[in-house]
């Protein structure tokens, strides 16, 4: 029934298996990839015809993680997978970026690539497996895919060794310094995505080359599978030679476009380019009705002519669109503290690209909860990137987070996270928000620069400031030019988008997307060297605005004080069912968080509230000291005295005889529940029971008073007791309405009465004879 084909290789200490022919057989191409015990199914389907009027390549990639893959049931009301998570969106982009350039120009059939994680072993990251499965499925589908590609994750240990396919946790753990993902063909690197702990250019380039070498093994396995199971290739219309038509078009609008691309102002340049395009449409208007296909074909050549004019000007004359040198960075203006009520803010402007970045500091309960295959986890650092349509002078959808915004935000996140302080040093939740207000290239790197400044303005003690730059490439044969700080048009018309961010110590993030084959190690080395000089220049401009983090957090930010208690005291601070900790929060107004190690974080924007909560907690965990005076509150009144809460979480008994020096008939004559009193600790018995006294403390000042009560005389042999000799019968007599018998002949001082028939069974042990 099944014509199953399988290829397996040993790779990175595990077996990688690619299977086809058993599952999803109606798709154009379907591959089940297994690595370790992580299994990903990728299915590829394509439309057989192009939609009318289609003038772009509609490739859509969907990556989905099934909770069942990790033996979990999704949360929420519906208990099923919902909209794509951030990780799923980023992995979809990770697959899309190296695959898209490998389809021929002019191929506009719609393609769906769907990758689903079916099993996850908790160690093998499924994103790499999904990239390999997608490449294999496209390769055997018969589509005009100029692959295959391989993919690999690389780590870099403290010992200076590269590691193939570490888990994400290990890659950036205590012994890890790098999380780098590479996608490549047999001959060239196509895509790089990474986060690093301030590594050098040489170390980063070495990791890329290591990943490329390892990915070739995967490419070999995919080719072996294709030799067994590949479908017949699609028949494509022969590519028409349009060089003659291009030269005719150059004669119509070539001069207009050349002049337009020398205008430095983006809006004015765009107007001039649009005027040239309109001129082309008018020139070929006679074809619009007689030969619509030819008419559309001629108009598509306008974009190719634009690219040709810009690229030749850069390669031959070294002339960029805005007149800069190839290694020149646009003018930079940076300022901080522009928004009065935010915790930190910065405005970063580079040419016609601008970002307003704000930093907000929160407490532990503001951490982001992430529910994925690995289970619940929490992140105390967030970076959100917004790209409103007005930033490019357009009308468009607002308020919806696009895949591009998610990807750009994550790139800036990776660039800044390595320089954040440890949570023990700075126990805040940090949210950086970047709103792009103008855009003409490299807005994600403006977010890195602005985000770094806004965090320093908020008082976040960064290890070092971080700057970022976007590099470009124009490649024609063996001739190439690397461009620093590219414009939007240079990005669209060029061959590479190469973003580098880092501190003065090294690179923290590297992202590369290549649109053509032939990017050599020499080109990447040149780009990294040029980027290093550009980053240093930008960092200098940032330092002029703010050289280092402010000494303290904003006055509008919450204060967080950390204290450590013994683990055995945690339950005392929390109380039964959380009663004590809730009372602390309710009474003081401060937030209190406590972890399993006994680390307590107290937060509030009011220093007095923090101090009140701290003292309360100290009172709970502190041991009572005999002879010391404390503030307390009456929490319960009984016949023989009152229980007083002191030191926040301790109760002690003030016997009726210790309320005043003179005789007290009833405790309620002296105190009432909720009353604030001052007490002295007289005794703590072996069971921790505390005996307190009010009579030796001035209730106004809290000062200790001299004990004027004469000492009690020795009682000697007390003999038989009248009036109900059985002590359990009670001896209250008529003096306290106790209903017991006699005993009235003895003056027993403060121990008289008050048991209401209960006898000494109600008296604490340390008060009994």
Swiss-Prot record:
Record localization: Cytoplasm
Protein's gene: pnp
Domain S1 motif, chain residue ranges per copy: 627-695
Major localization class: cytoplasm
Record domain KH: where: 558-617
Superkingdom to which the source organism belongs: Bacteria
Protein name (Swiss-Prot/TrEMBL): Polyribonucleotide nucleotidyltransferase
Reaction catalysed by this enzyme: RNA(n+1) + phosphate = RNA(n) + a ribonucleoside 5'-diphosphate
Any one Pfam family match given in the protein's UniProt record, by short name: RNase_PH_C
Function in brief: Involved in mRNA degradation. Catalyzes the phosphorolysis of single-stranded polyribonucleotides processively in the 3'- to 5'-direction.
Broad class of enzyme this protein falls into: transferase
């Amino acid at each position: 029934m099944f014509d199953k084909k399988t290829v397996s290789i040993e790779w990175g200490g595990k077996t990688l298996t690619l299977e086809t022919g058993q599952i999803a057989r109606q798709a154009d191409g379907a591959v089940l990839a297994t690595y370790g015990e992580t299994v990903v199914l990728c299915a590829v389907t394509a439309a057989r015809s192009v939609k009318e009027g289609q003038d772009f390549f509609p490739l859509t990639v969907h990556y989905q993680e099934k909770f069942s893959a990790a033996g979990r049931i999704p949360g929420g009301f519906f208990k099923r997978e919902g909209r794509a998570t951030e990780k799923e969106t980023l992995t979809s982009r990770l697959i899309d970026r190296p695959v898209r350039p490998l389809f021929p120009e002019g191929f506009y059939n719609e393609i769906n690539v769907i990758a689903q994680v079916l099993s996850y072993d908790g160690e093998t990251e499924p994103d790499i497996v999904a990239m390999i499965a997608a490449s294999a499925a496209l390769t055997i589908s018969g589509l005009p895919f100029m692959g295959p590609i391989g993919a690999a994750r690389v780590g870099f240990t403290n010992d200076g060794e590269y590691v193939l396919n570490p888990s994400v946790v290990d890659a950036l753990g205590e012994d890890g310094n790098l999380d780098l993902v590479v996608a490549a063909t047999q001959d060239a690197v196509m895509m790089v995505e990474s986060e690093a702990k301030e590594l050098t250019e040489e170390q980063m380039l070495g990791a890329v080359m290591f990943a490329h070498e390892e990915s070739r093994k995967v490419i070999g396995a995919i080719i072996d599978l294709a030799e067994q199971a590949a479908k017949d290739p699609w028949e494509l219309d022969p590519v028409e030679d349009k060089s003659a038509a291009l030269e005719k078009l150059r004669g119509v609008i070539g001069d207009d476009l050349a002049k337009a691309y020398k205008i430095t102002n983006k809006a004015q340049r765009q107007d001039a380019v649009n005027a040239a395009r309109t001129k082309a449409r008018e020139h070929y208007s006679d074809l619009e009705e007689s030969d619509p296909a030819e008419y559309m074909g001629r108009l598509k050549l306008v974009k190719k002519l634009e690219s040709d004019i810009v690229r030749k000007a850069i390669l031959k004359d070294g002339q960029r669109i805005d007149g800069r040198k190839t290694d020149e960075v646009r003018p930079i203006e940076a300022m901080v503290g522009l928004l009065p009520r935010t915790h930190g803010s910065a405005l970063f402007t580079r040419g016609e690209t601008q970002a307003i970045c704000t930093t907000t500091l929160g407490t532990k309960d503001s951490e982001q909860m992430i529910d994925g295959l690995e289970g619940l986890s929490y992140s105390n650092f967030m970076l959100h990137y917004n790209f409103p349509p007005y930033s490019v002078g357009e009308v468009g959808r607002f308020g919806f987070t696009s895949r591009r915004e998610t990807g750009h935000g994550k790139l800036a996140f990776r660039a800044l996270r390595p320089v954040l302080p440890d949570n023990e040093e700075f126990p805040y939740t940090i949210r950086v928000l970047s709103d792009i207000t103008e855009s003409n290239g490299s807005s994600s790197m403006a977010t890195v620069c602005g985000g770094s400044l806004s965090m320093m303005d908020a008082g976040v003690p960064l290890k070092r400031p971080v700057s970022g730059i976007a590099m470009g490439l124009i490649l024609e044969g063996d001739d190439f030019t690397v461009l620093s700080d590219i414009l939007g048009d240079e990005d669209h018309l060029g061959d590479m988008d190469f973003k580098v961010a880092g501190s003065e110590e090294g690179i923290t993030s590297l992202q590369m997307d290549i649109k053509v084959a032939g990017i050599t190690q020499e080109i990447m080395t040149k780009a990294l060297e040029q980027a290093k000089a550009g980053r240093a220049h930008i960092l200098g401009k940032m330092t002029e605005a703010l050289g280092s983090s402010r000494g303290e957090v904003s006055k509008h930010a919450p204060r967080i004080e950390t204290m450590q208690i013994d683990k055995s005291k945690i339950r005392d601070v929390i109380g039964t069912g959380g009663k004590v900790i809730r009372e602390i929060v309710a009474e003081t107004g401060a937030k209190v968080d406590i972890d399993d190690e006994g680390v307590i974080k107290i937060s509030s924007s009011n220093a007095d509230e923090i101090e009140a909560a701290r003292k309360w907690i100290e009172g709970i965990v502190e041991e009572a000291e005999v002879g010391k005076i404390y503030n307390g509150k009456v929490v319960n009144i009984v016949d023989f005295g009152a229980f007083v809460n002191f030191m926040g979480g301790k109760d002690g008994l003030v016997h009726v005889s210790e309320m005043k020096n003179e005789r007290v008939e009833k405790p309620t004559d002296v105190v009432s529940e909720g009353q604030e009193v001052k007490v002295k600790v007289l005794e703590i018995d072996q069971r921790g029971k505390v005996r307190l006294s009010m009579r030796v403390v001035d209730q106004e000042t809290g000062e200790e008073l001299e004990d004027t009560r004469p000492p009690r005389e020795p009682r000697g042999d007390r003999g038989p007791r009248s009036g109900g000799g059985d002590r359990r019968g009670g001896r209250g007599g008529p003096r306290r309405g106790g209903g017991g018998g006699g005993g009235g002949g003895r003056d027993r001082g403060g121990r008289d009465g008050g048991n209401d028939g209960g006898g000494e069974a109600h008296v604490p042990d340390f008060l009994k004879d």
